[in-house]
């Protein structure tokens, strides 16, 4: 019975190992048998200690494997490991003798299939959208006519050729190309650096700062376009102070940079069409605006001319304005002379009955005093009447002087209106300065033709045809009566002015006889 509890005797042919020797042997076998392997599984229990190394598990429904990614390699992984993500890890198998377990040293990692990529893409899109990077309020309008366009794409391939060809056909512009890798590990950092690099260019520097950016790439699979879904690219596009057009892939391809860009183009060619207008269409629009401008200028001149003619017809003649007051003056002057005679006769009639009752000496004294008083009043009345007549004459002369230059002021107003119209046309022409030089030259010719027309309609052109302007004391004379009353005439011909004196003076009007004595 005691033999049942005794250990069997070891075979003399079975080797004996220490724990370290056996662990080392297992390590060598695993590392030699499984070199570089690719393992598919779900990530679980992710740990990131202060050392910078990355520890996590790879598992499926039946087994779990430990995985390690050293610090130097963890920063270069194309996918950031997150718990629950299904990935394909590439690395080398080894063991950890201290705990007697095997593990994989991960060198690279990628999502396992399109489904995993789409799940990760949707999760990243939701996180960035929650930060407000895709808000419509952040998007800027594209410049109407950019002088410099920056293109971020591969320097070779059909994409850049299509963009340059389309820009050349529509509106040739200055294009700066920032060459980048459009797929692979270098794609995301190079694209982000290019966007930020264009934004750091100073205004007025040796390299012109773009007014518009285009990030372009041709079509491809989800994996090929993955670089444009990276967070650094999306943030660079959202932070760009220069308006940006995303033209990545075909119309059915959508990347995260499309949401962050100010505009999304379905193709690189469509991006070029969004960037610049068609030059021929601009020229056609400019022709139409120039024609409308010419019609507007002609209509303005026609309305001003018609207004001047209407004012000239509505202005009364000088003779009709002066005729009424002059007739009233003559009437009152005649009545005044008759009233004086009647007043003297009435006083004489009152004095004659009294003379019979008065002594001669007393009567003579009374008559002398009355005569003196009457003489004083007569002289005062004559002085007053003279001053009133002089003031009335001065008022009539002033009225005549104000009305005589009326036509001259109308002519001056016409010239000022023409100058204002010319200035308006000049301002409108200056606003069109950015248009092509050929169109500007044609507009300038039209403006010069209008200016020549203005000069032709001026009175100086009329002087060249044999007419003359007659002035007296700086005022324009329009009637024979005004010319006959002037002492000196100034005649303006087309080549200068000539002063002319009258050959004989008009005989002055005789003064009325003084009031005689009553006795």
UniProtKB/Swiss-Prot annotation:
Transmembrane segments: none
Region of interest called Disordered, as start-end residue ranges on this chain: 500-519
GO terms of biological process kind: DNA catabolic process
Cystine crosslinks: none
Catalytic activity reported: Exonucleolytic cleavage in either 5'- to 3'- or 3'- to 5'-direction to yield nucleoside 5'-phosphates
UniProt entry keywords in alphabetical sequence: Cytoplasm, Exonuclease, Hydrolase, Nuclease
Keyword Magnesium attached: no
Subcellular locations according to the entry: Cytoplasm
Enzyme class, first EC level, given as a word: hydrolase
GO molecular function, one term: nucleic acid binding
Primary location class: cytoplasm
Assigned EC number: 3.1.11.6
GO cellular component terms attached to this protein's record: cytoplasm; exodeoxyribonuclease VII complex
UniProt-listed Pfam families: Exonuc_VII_L, tRNA_anti_2
Function: Bidirectionally degrades single-stranded DNA into large acid-insoluble oligonucleotides, which are then degraded further into small acid-soluble oligonucleotides.
Subunit structure of this chain's protein: Heterooligomer composed of large and small subunits.
Similarity annotation: Belongs to the XseA family.
Name this polypeptide is given: Exodeoxyribonuclease 7 large subunit
Species name: Cereibacter sphaeroides (strain ATCC 17029 / ATH 2.4.9) (Rhodobacter sphaeroides)
């Amino acid at each position: 019975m005691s033999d049942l509890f005794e250990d069997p005797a070891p075979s003399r042919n079975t080797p004996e190992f220490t724990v370290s020797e056996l662990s080392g042997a297992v390590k060598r076998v695993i590392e030699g048998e499984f070199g570089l392997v690719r393992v598919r599984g779900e990530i679980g229990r992710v740990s990131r200690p202060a050392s910078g190394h990355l520890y996590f598990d790879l598992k499926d429904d039946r087994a779990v494997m430990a995985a390690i990614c050293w610090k130097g390699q963890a920063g270069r992984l194309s996918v950031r490991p997150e718990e629950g993500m299904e990935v394909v890890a590439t690395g080398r198998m080894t063991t950890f003798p201290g705990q007697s377990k095997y593990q994989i040293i991960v060198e690279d990692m990628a999502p396992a299939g399109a489904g995993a990529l789409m799940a990760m893409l949707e999760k990243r899109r939701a996180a960035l959208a929650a930060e407000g990077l895709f808000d419509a309020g952040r998007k800027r309008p594209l410049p109407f006519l950019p002088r410099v366009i920056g293109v971020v794409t591969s320097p070779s391939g059909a994409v850049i050729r299509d963009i340059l060809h389309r820009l050349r056909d529509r509106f040739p512009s200055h294009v700066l190309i920032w060459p980048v890798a459009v797929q692979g590990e270098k794609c995301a950092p190079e694209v982000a650096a290019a966007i930020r690099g264009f934004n750091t260019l100073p205004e007025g520097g040796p390299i012109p700062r773009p007014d518009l950016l285009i990030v372009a790439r041709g079509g491809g699979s989800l994996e090929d376009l993955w670089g444009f879904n990276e967070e650094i690219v999306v943030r660079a596009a959202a932070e760009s102070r220069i308006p940006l057009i995303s033209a990545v892939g075909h119309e059915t391809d959508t990347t995260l940079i499309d949401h962050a860009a100010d505009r999304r183009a379905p193709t690189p060619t469509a991006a070029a069409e969004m960037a610049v207008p068609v030059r021929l269409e601009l020229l056609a629009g400019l022709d139409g605006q120039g024609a409308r401008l010419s019609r507007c200028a002609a209509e303005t001149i026609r309305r001003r001319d018609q207004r001047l003619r209407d004012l000239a017809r509505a202005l009364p003649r000088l003779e009709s304005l002066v005729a009424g007051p002059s007739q009233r003056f003559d009437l009152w002057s005649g009545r005044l002379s008759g009233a004086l005679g009647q007043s003297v006769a009435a006083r004489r009639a009152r004095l004659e009955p009294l003379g019979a009752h008065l002594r001669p000496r007393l009567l003579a004294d009374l008559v002398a005093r009355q005569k003196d008083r009457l003489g004083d009043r007569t002289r005062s009345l004559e002085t007053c009447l003279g001053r009133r007549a002089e003031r009335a004459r001065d008022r009539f002369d002033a009225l005549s002087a104000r009305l005589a230059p009326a036509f001259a002021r109308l002519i001056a107003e016409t010239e000022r209106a023409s100058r204002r119209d010319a200035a308006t046309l000049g301002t409108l022409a200056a606003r069109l300065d950015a248009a092509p030089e050929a169109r500007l030259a044609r507009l300038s010719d039209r403006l010069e033709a209008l200016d020549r027309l203005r000069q032709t309609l001026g009175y100086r052109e009329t002087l060249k045809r044999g007419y003359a302007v007659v002035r007296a004391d700086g005022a324009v004379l329009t009637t024979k009566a005004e010319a006959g009353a002037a002492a000196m005439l100034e005649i303006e011909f087309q080549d200068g002015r000539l002063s002319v004196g009258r050959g004989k003076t008009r005989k002055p009007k005789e003064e009325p006889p003084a009031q005689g004595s009553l006795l």
